From Swiss-Prot:
It is found in: Secreted. Promotes hydrolysis of glycogen and lipids, and raises the blood sugar level. This is Glucagon-1. GO terms for biological process: response to starvation. The keyword Nucleotide-binding does not apply. It comes from Oncorhynchus mykiss. InterPro entries: Glucagon, Glucagon_GIP_secretin_VIP, Ppantetheine_attach_site. It comes from the Eukaryota. GO terms for cellular component: extracellular region. Residues 1-21 form the signal peptide.
Length: 178
């Protein structure tokens, strides 16, 4: 019996050791994982450092490019100012264009009122007697063939307007007569 009790004791001892050994192994496995975590963190840190240095390089390069572009722009401004060529500002051009448009509209209104007043026939008769006079356009240029064509078109338009206005006037007189 002593042999059976010893055998039972040895088996119990082996079972207890296994039971105790498995939590220790799990603890060692956890500790080995914990030790690998800092290693992984170190590796991640190294890759982060690499990324940071790449970002620093690209950031420095971007700053260099911006500074270079600014220097090129300043150099271009200085060169364009030295050339002495007259520069035209957009605001001046817009103002000039607006004034020109206004003057052209005013000239067209004056021309139509001149045609309506009937002075056109009298002046053209005087011109044919005295010879052609050089008239100037609003902007100071001499009258060209295009302006002469436009004048004749305006005269035709005026005559058409006069003819249609007289027709409506005759119809009013006819209605009053009846």
């Amino acid at each position: 019996m002593f042999g059976i009790h010893s055998l039972a004791g040895v088996l119990l001892l082996v079972i207890v050791q296994r039971q105790l050994a498995s939590p220790l192994q799990e603890a060692e496995d956890n500790s080995s994982l914990e030790t690998t975590d800092p290693l992984l963190e170190d590796l991640m840190g190294v890759s982060n450092v690499k990324r940071h240095s790449e970002g620093t390089f690209s950031n420095d390069y971007s700053k260099y490019q911006e500074e270079r572009m600014a220097q090129d722009f300043v150099q271009w401004l200085m060169n364009s100012k030295r050339s002495g060529a007259p520069s035209k500002r957009h605001a001046d051009g817009t103002y000039t264009s607006d004034v020109s448009t206004y003057l052209q509209d005013q000239a067209a209104k004056d021309f139509v009122s001149w045609l309506k007043s009937g002075r056109a026939r009298r002046e053209s008769a005087e011109e044919s007697r005295n010879g052609p006079m050089s008239r100037r356009h609003v902007d100071g240029s001499f009258t060209s063939d295009v302006n002469k064509v436009l004048d004749s078109l305006a005269a035709k338009e005026y005559l058409l307007w006069v003819m249609t206005s007289k027709t409506s006037g005759k119809s009013n007189k006819r209605q009053e007569d009846h």
